[in-house]
Structures are given as structure tokens and as C-alpha cells.
């Protein structure tokens, strides 16, 4: 690798050719603040918070000092860089003041207060008052979506959301509109977000450094239900929530807080706190049964997983001709609600109309999913309210519960049994691996000793694997992120790729990187692979369990014995399966 000799703040360093000033400073252990920069996603130098002074060689001597944006400016041989002079600090402060001059400063009531990157930089640089007054850009609030709220009065035009939607997800429903001072981030033809092909994945939210984008807050609905003594209010927690909820309370990413999460939810007053891993296991049994039936009886292949509502809506918009390939299984969230309002309601003597079922999930698209058609096994919606990991964190704080001081507690019976296969649903490749653990045993007709299908693990955008099961070859593929889903499906259609079973998640890395997960600043996201760190919690949990196959879950067996009959039965299809819409563009 070619190396360059440079100086940073008077010290000599050697850095790889092609490095930016920001890369070089980071390798030297020097932090340069950024605001618009997201590594590999948004590298445009727009906010100018990362200003530094550089001198470049002009023949045998250094040229004059000038200011450049560190995030995009490449280093050159002999370059001298100054990262924190008084002139630089004042320039950064001035840029922050200019941003604030056109910004809604209702910080006390903003969802992003204390996690806002603009707020932190203003504190760091001593921005105490606004020296610039005058006209502000005309903005409005788009609250048409059931998942995502857009408030352009808090937008700083960093374009991180635009890059996440276009560059990372290859959807591009939002972009810069108008020119000059009137520029805002908007949709094509200024449509309401709900009327676009937005898939509600929420990657724009986790990319946003301010409160310009956030999930629709449904915490008041939950508290209202909890206060209604005529209602039976239950909650279930998705696999990945336990691996991220601690981040809301200062724990390092990658900390498993399942026990404290359960304890906190119980103290909020839910009648039952249940583990969604159980219906992840149930999903696997139904989905693998469906796959085997399609393979044996000439059904539509490849079959594609249906757990991710963002992916489902993407398919309905962009690949409507492939909706027949989708598994008809409801997601684990919807299956749980269906089981609660049919089997459990009957067992307890509850009227389904008196049950409020809440799901704690990492996903903003789940808010859209609860209102989808054909998701009402008992004649009422399977799930009433979906709250993100962030909303759960806010509910716990609002209730005055000291999360860190809580003891570890267990999920409530009878929905407390789950396998490691259900746990790994939260990571890309997890659904595929869980399904293979079941399908392989059915095809082989014997107990599977090796349950780790490591070929489908990892954060690579697209993964392929072929398994030879006593002469039966099963070809599988895994993709996460809609951009990668598009590439995979186009390859399947053209014949470039071949697979019988495909797992697709809308969010890159899967649910652990969902749009409803705790905020992490760009400084963390640019240096830590949060997807891998969070997924490791789930894989460690799986590896530590004796029960690692969905089909061996006693809770799932009991559901079939007492209520559903057999996997793929008529009753199972009535309660656990759904249909899709060809939305088109």
C-alpha cells in the first residue's frame, strides 16, 4: 500500500494514499467534529463543521494555509494540517450559529433533546445566543405517515436522510426541493409521505442528526390503555429489543439487557410481559412447512420470507409481480397478536375486544403493519399498538423507573419459552438459519446434530449458500437493505442468481439496525459496526441455550396440540397466514 508523509498539528504521520483529512486525523487519534458526514453513505462536505487548515506542497515549499472540509478533502504528500486553531474553532462556531439562525429551537420539547448532534456541537463550541436574525425558511410538518413524522423546521439540510433513502436503500422518496434559501427536504411533487412509495423502514430517522425526522410517538396510547381498568393489556418484546434497549440508558452497544427490560415492562403495569421469540419459533415451523410443500408440490419458488414489513411494502411497490413468491406467514408480531386474541382469549375467557396487545419492536414499519388488511384473526386487529425500542425507553423514563437498578426478571408464562433459533431472528440471516434448522430435519428425516449454518451469518449485503441434504440440494440467499434486495431479485429474474428460499430484511443488517433502534451519533456509527456488535448479543444468546431449534419449543408444540392442529393446517392458515397487495408505483 502506498503511504504518504504528512503533519497533523506539528506531528509527523504516515497514512495510506487516498485517505481524506478526516481519515488521517482519525488514524492519528484526533477527533474532528462532523455533522453531515456518514461514512460510505453521505460524504458531501455540506455542513462545513469539519473545517481544518491545510498547507500543501508547492514545489519544495509549503503553500499558503487555507480552509477545507476534512471529510472529503484528500491528503497529499507533505501536507501540513491544523485541526483546532482558534481560527478554526471560531469558523465552526460561526457555521453553527448560521445553522441555528434558521432552526426551530424548541429543544426542551424535542424528541432528540440530549441525543441531538447539533445540540451537542453547540454546547461543545459555546454557542449561547443567536447573532443572526431575519426571515426563516417556510416549513411545515408532514404527519401523514403512521410511522414517520417529518418536521422541516428542525432540518439543517445535511442531506443524511436523503443519502440513507437513495444511496443506502435505493428508494429515493425524499430529496432537496427548491433553490437557495427556500431549499427544503421534500417528496416528489410535494406529496404527503404516506402517498409515496416510502416503505417506512425508518433509516432516514436513524440517519438524521436532529429532530427533523422521528417515529410517530404512540406512548400516550399505551399509557391510556394501561389506565383503562376494563382492558387486558399485554406486551411482547421482539428478539433484538433486548440487545439494544440498554443503549437508551447509557449501556454500551452490545449489552444484553433482557432481564432488566422484562422487569421494567412489568413495572409499567402490563398484565403479561411475553417473549416474541416464541412466535418467531412458530413462524419458522409454519414457514418451513410452507417451503417444503412448495418444493415437493411445485409451488411458486423461490419462496421469500415475510417477517419484515418494510420489505413487504417494498415488494408490493417495486416487485408486485413477485408477491406470489412471498411466504403467506404473518410476521412474529402479528402471529403473537393473533394467538393472544384467539387461543389465549378463549382460554382465559376474555373478549378479544377487551384485549389491548402491544408489541415492543425495533422497527418503524411495524406501525404500518398493524393496520394492514387481513391481520385480524379474531375479527379485531391482531396488534393494537407497536412501539419502537426508543419509545419503550421513553416510557420507562416517564414512569420514573430506574432501569439500571432493576433486578433481572423472567418473561411471564405461558409465553416464556423460546429457542435460540427464535432469538437470532433479529440479525440478517437469522430467519434463514432458523428455518434451515427445521427444514433440514424434515428433509433428512432425522435429528440434526450440527445446527450452526454460519454461511448465512454476517453483515455482507448479499449471501448465498447451497446445502446438500442427502442428495436434496437446497439453494438459499440472504439480503438485507432494499438496495441489496433489488439487486438480488433482479438477478433472480434474469437467471444470474438461483435460489429456492430467500430471506430479505428491509434494514441493512436486519432488525438490530432497525429504524426504531436507539440513536447513536455519527461519531459512533462511523467507527463501530453497530450491526455486528448488536447481532453478537443474539448469537451469543443462541449459542448458550440447550434449546436451539424452533420445532423443539414446548410452547409451540402446546399451541399446535391445543389449538392449531398441525403445521400448515386449515386452522393455522386462518390464524397465522395473510395475503398481499400489488401496489405498484
Model regions: which residues?
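Conserved functional loop/turn residues at catalytic and ligand-binding sites
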Residues: 29, 159, 202, 212, ...
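Iron-sulfur-associated redox domains of electron-transfer enzymes in respiratory
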Residues: 4-5, 12, 17-78, 82-84, ...
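Fe-S ferredoxin-like electron-transfer domains
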Residues: 48-200, 213-232
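A short, structure-level motif marking secondary-structure boundaries and short turns
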Residues: 5-8, 137, 146-148, 188-190, ...
Amino acid at each position: 500500500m502506498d503511504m504518504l508523509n504528512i503533519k497533523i498539528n506539528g506531528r509527523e504521520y504516515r497514512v495510506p494514499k487516498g485517505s481524506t483529512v478526516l481519515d488521517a486525523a482519525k488514524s492519528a487519534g484526533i477527533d474532528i467534529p462532523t455533522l453531515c458526514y456518514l461514512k460510505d453513505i453521505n460524504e458531501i462536505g455540506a455542513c462545513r463543521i469539519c473545517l481544518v487548515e491545510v498547507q500543501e506542497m508547492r514545489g519544495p515549499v509549503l503553500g499558503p494555509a487555507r480552509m477545507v472540509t476534512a471529510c472529503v478533502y484528500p491528503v497529499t504528500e507533505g501536507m501540513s494540517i491544523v485541526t483546532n486553531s482558534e481560527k478554526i474553532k471560531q469558523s465552526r462556531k460561526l457555521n453553527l450559529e448560521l445553522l441555528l439562525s434558521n432552526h426551530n429551537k424548541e429543544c426542551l420539547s424535542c424528541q432528540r433533546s440530549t441525543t441531538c448532534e447539533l445540540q451537542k456541537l453547540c454546547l461543545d463550541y459555546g454557542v449561547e445566543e443567536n447573532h443572526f436574525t431575519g426571515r426563516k425558511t417556510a416549513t411545515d410538518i408532514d404527519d401523514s405517515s403512521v410511522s414517520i413524522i417529518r418536521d422541516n423546521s428542525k432540518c439543517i439540510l445535511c442531506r443524511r436522510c436523503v443519502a440513507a433513502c437513495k444511496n443506502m436503500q435505493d428508494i429515493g422518496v425524499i430529496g432537496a426541493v427548491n433553490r437557495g434559501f427556500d431549499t427544503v427536504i421534500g417528496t416528489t411533487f410535494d406529496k404527503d409521505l404516506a402517498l409515496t412509495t416510502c416503505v417506512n423502514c425508518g433509516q432516514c430517522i436513524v440517519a438524521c442528526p436532529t429532530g427533523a425526522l422521528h417515529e410517530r410517538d404512540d406512548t400516550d396510547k399505551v399509557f391510556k390503555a394501561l389506565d383503562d381498568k376494563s382492558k387486558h393489556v399485554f406486551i411482547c418484546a421482539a428478539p433484538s429489543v433486548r440487545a439494544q434497549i440498554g443503549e437508551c440508558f447509557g449501556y454500551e452497544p452490545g449489552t444484553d439487557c433482557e432481564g432488566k427490560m422484562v422487569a421494567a415492562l412489568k413495572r409499567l403495569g402490563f398484565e403479561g410481559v411475553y417473549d416474541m421469540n416464541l412466535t418467531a419459533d412458530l413462524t419458522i415451523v409454519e414457514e418451513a412447512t410452507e417451503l417444503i410443500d412448495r418444493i415437493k408440490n411445485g409451488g411458486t419458488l423461490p419462496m421469500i420470507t415475510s417477517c419484515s414489513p418494510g420489505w413487504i411494502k417494498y415488494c408490493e411497490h417495486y416487485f408486485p409481480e413477485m408477491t406470489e413468491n412471498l411466504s403467506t406467514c404473518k410476521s412474529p408480531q402479528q402471529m403473537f397478536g393473533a394467538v393472544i386474541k384467539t387461543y389465549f382469549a378463549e382460554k382465559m375467557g376474555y373478549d378479544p375486544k377487551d384485549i389491548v396487545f402491544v408489541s415492543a419492536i425495533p422497527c418503524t414499519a411495524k406501525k404500518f403493519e398493524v393496520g394492514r388488511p387481513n391481520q385480524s384473526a379474531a375479527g379485531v386487529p391482531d396488534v393494537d399498538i407497536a412501539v419502537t425500542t426508543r419509545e419503550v425507553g421513553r416510557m420507562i423514563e416517564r414512569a420514573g423507573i430506574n432501569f439500571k437498578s432493576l433486578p433481572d426478571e423472567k418473561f411471564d408464562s405461558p409465553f416464556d419459552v423460546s429457542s435460540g433459533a427464535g432469538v437470532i431472528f433479529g440479525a440478517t440471516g437469522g430467519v434463514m438459519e432458523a428455518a434451515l434448522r427445521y427444514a433440514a430435519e424434515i428433509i433428512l428425516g432425522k435429528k440434526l446434530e450440527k445446527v450452526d449454518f454460519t454461511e448465512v451469518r454476517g453483515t455482507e449485503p448479499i449471501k448465498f449458500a447451497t446445502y446438500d441434504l442427502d442428495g436434496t440440494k437446497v439453494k438459499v440467499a440472504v439480503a438485507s437493505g432494499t438496495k441489496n434486495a433489488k439487486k438480488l431479485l433482479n438477478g433472480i429474474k434474469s437467471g444470474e442468481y438461483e435460489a429456492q428460499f430467500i430471506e430479505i430484511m428491509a434494514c441493512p443488517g436486519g432488525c438490530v439496525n432497525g429504524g426504531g433502534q436507539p440513536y447513536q451519533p455519527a461519531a459512533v456509527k462511523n467507527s463501530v459496526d453497530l450491526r455486528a456488535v448488536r447481532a453478537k448479543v443474539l448469537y451469543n444468546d443462541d449459542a448458550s441455550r440447550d434449546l436451539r431449534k424452533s420445532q423443539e419449543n414446548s410452547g409451540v408444540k402446546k399451541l399446535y396440540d391445543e389449538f392449531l392442529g398441525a403445521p400448515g393446517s386449515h386452522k393455522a392458515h386462518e390464524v397465522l397466514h395473510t395475503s398481499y397487495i400489488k401496489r405498484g408505483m
